């Protein structure tokens, strides 16, 4: 993970990073576009995830594993969104970090902690869907809210430990009367960077894709299922994979290219700028995850959709909102209908 890439920088490293920063400076137009993007992203993601988290906490009695994972996903998204205003200030200030060293470390730590936590919670949701649909009876003892909470606690601890180096290593560099926070876009790379990227992203991504391929095969080969239930499962698969492909795949592909460049050295200023711009764009896409997850809730969770209509529609819906999931039982059809 990115925390594993953070090493104590030498003077040579800082000089190289300063050179990269000078070559990668944005134009005023680029700064304005990035700032507008983060402002819109912050508003949409904050409202959507705050509403989702309130609903998940309010409906905690439903006691389903998927609800637990969705609640932790909303917490991760909301925590990640709360550091986006620092990027707004950075771009409005003309690539200058005015907050100092400690806030820079905290911003990097919180952003990457919650980004990778979101990735792993999406993977947990995929695994839960796989067990519920492909092995509905065998997984009854495993798919319990307590186990889901324990899994989430374990993931929070693991990701926090992996990101901890961001809190202890210097992350600011001064260039031409401006201070740059390295954790906003260009993390310091190390020899462990590619290996950490593989552990942090490749494993959960492959796991998620595998789960959904097996789910699709089960839906095609299994007993006859109502069309709307099958469509709901396909909708869930499409949404989660779309979030991975839009938000996380471009960033990690570009990150691998950047790490290889960093270790190679001798890159022209034009190439440095291209890499810097790529970092900014793909990082924007990762932060978009916070705005897209509530869209997923809307399409796959009936209670979220019901509550949102109650808030926005002039005519409030009558009757109690449906649960996010039905009560788990030993029926394959019931398990397939969850979410």
Swiss-Prot record:
Gene Ontology CC: one annotated term: plasma membrane
Location(s) in or outside the cell: Cell membrane
Membrane-traversing stretches: 37-57, 65-85, 106-126, 148-168, 196-216, 233-253, 281-301
Membrane topology, record value: Multi-pass membrane protein
PROSITE patterns in the record: G_PROTEIN_RECEP_F1_1, G_PROTEIN_RECEP_F1_2
One of the protein's GO biological processes: negative regulation of inflammatory response to antigenic stimulus
Disulphide bridges, residue numbers: 104-181
Entry's Gene Ontology molecular function annotations: G protein-coupled receptor activity; receptor serine/threonine kinase binding
Extracellular topological domain: 1-36, 86-105, 169-195, 254-280
Matches recorded under InterPro entries: GPCR_Rhodpsn, GPCR_Rhodpsn_7TM
Cited Pfam families: 7tm_1
Role of this protein: Dual specificity receptor for uracil nucleotides and cysteinyl leukotrienes (CysLTs). Signals through G(i) and inhibition of adenylyl cyclase. May mediate brain damage by nucleotides and CysLTs following ischemia.
Protein name listed in UniProt: Uracil nucleotide/cysteinyl leukotriene receptor
Organism: Mus musculus
């Amino acid at each position: 993970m990115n925390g594993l890439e953070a090493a104590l920088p030498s003077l040579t490293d800082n000089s190289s990073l300063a050179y990269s920063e000078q070559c990668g400076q944005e134009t005023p137009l680029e700064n304005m576009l990035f700032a507008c993007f983060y402002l819109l992203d912050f508003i949409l993601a904050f409202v959507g995830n705050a509403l989702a988290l309130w609903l998940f906490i309010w409906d905690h009695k439903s006691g389903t594993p998927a609800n637990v994972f969705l609640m932790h996903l909303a917490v991760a998204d909301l925590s990640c969104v709360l550091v986006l205003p620092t990027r707004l200030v950075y771009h409005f200030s003309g690539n200058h970090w005015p907050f100092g060293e400690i806030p820079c470390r905290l911003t990097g730590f919180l952003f990457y902690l919650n980004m990778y936590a979101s990735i792993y919670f999406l993977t947990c949701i995929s695994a839960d869907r796989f067990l519920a649909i492909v092995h509905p009876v065998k997984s009854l003892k495993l798919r319990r809210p307590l186990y889901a909470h324990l899994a989430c606690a374990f993931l929070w601890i693991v990701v926090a430990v992996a990101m901890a180096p961001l809190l202890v290593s210097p992350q600011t560099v001064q260039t031409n009367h401006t201070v740059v926070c390295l954790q906003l876009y260009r993390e310091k790379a190390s020899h462990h960077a590619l290996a950490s990227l593989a552990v942090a992203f490749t494993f959960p991504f492959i796991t998620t894709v595998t789960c959904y391929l097996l789910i699709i095969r089960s839906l095609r080969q299994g007993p006859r299922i109502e069309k709307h239930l099958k469509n709901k499962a396909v909708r869930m698969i499409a949404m989660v994979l779309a979030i991975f492909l839009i938000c996380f795949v471009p960033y990690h592909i570009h990150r691998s290219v950047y790490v290889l460049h960093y270790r190679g050295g001798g890159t022209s200023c034009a190439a440095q700028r291209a890499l810097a711009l790529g970092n900014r764009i793909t990082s924007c896409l990762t932060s978009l995850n916070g705005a897209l997850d509530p869209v997923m809730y809307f399409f796959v969770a009936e209670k979220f959709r019901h509550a949102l209509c109650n808030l926005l529609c002039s005519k409030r819906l009558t009757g109690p909102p449906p649960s996010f999931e039905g009560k788990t039982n030993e029926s394959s059809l019931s398990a397939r209908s969850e979410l």
